[in-house]
């Protein structure tokens, strides 16, 4: 059908908004997705196809339904960050969750609990700004990795971070030759990263340079200016390879403070290393932790923490267990977990094991771990792709009694739960929204092994 439409212009009206917050229309049964659109918007659609590429569509707005909500950011639709500032938050949350609700009702006969965001702006604790010649400091353009949208402020990061961004923009304007030019392969500075704790006052600023900038006269001069102009508690220079588009990774030089910042979650102190992952919105993630705290049984001895990272869940719920086993593939994160647990809970039998859970080699280790006792509670927080075949297979034959499945991708989570439906019974599900203005959600499912009796 699409071949017949190629190079012809058709008209399509947006019929609804999907869970990715994109408007959906149709041309002769061919679905089109249109960002930043709403039901009632009309577009001219021209399909075209280049050699060896998938068919694409050129969109031209014909008419737009009246907007009741004005995007507060002037860069909206140009910046690739937010995608829903044209939609009221109430409608955003409904669009993001409605299909999940219906599918859980249909497939599992269960209705998830929904917890909308309490803060819709100024919530994010980390932003990475690309630095381009100009100087231009901003985010990637929507749909393009090569172009940058210059930003004076960002409405989803903290106000303290925006103040530091303002100071940096004033500073870098005096060094026009410092930004790295991706085309000519000249210059030095690639990224400006801000990390602001939510439950402490600490702010970290990280500047990522090409390796050749290290130990130069220019570096020393710029270091002195940064110390005078920037106000963060921790200021770091980071050096990595010239062609790499990775921020806040590589060899570091500490100009001020430490190479980690302090965050508090559930009353526990976390040292967050400059290059490590941490929940982007700890306040928005709190409902997940409250849910687990409420549902964890008191009479169980052993917590298994899969995809444990630096022991986030282990440390928060350690007071309920006698033994903790954490598993992850990144040794540096495991070292942090071991150190923190030995300091906080020296009497708990804790071990953190390096295992690649997406490797076939993990199967035998997981099956031994999961068959050791029916007094085990499992918490798993996998990446967006889900648990993976080897974890799923091990769970099917396991003695794990209670399982908390935390996910940043409820769609892949639901697919995994379907594969486990003959072995575990879903007790409750919570879906929450730590990421307003974007299509992302967080969820937690509480499962009980079907043949387990208390």
From Swiss-Prot:
Entry keywords, A to Z: 4Fe-4S, Iron, Iron-sulfur, Metal-binding, Methyltransferase, S-adenosyl-L-methionine, Transferase
E.C. no: 2.1.1.-
Catalytic residue positions: 408
Cellular component terms (Gene Ontology): membrane
Enzyme class, first EC level, given as a word: transferase
Binding site residues for [4Fe-4S] cluster: 73, 79, 82, 154
GO aspect biological process, one term: rRNA base methylation
Pfam families, A to Z: tRNA_U5-meth_tr
Family as reported in the entry's similarity comment: Belongs to the class I-like SAM-binding methyltransferase superfamily. RNA M5U methyltransferase family.
Protein name per UniProt: Uncharacterized RNA methyltransferase LA_2977
Protein source organism: Leptospira interrogans serogroup Icterohaemorrhagiae serovar Lai (strain 56601)
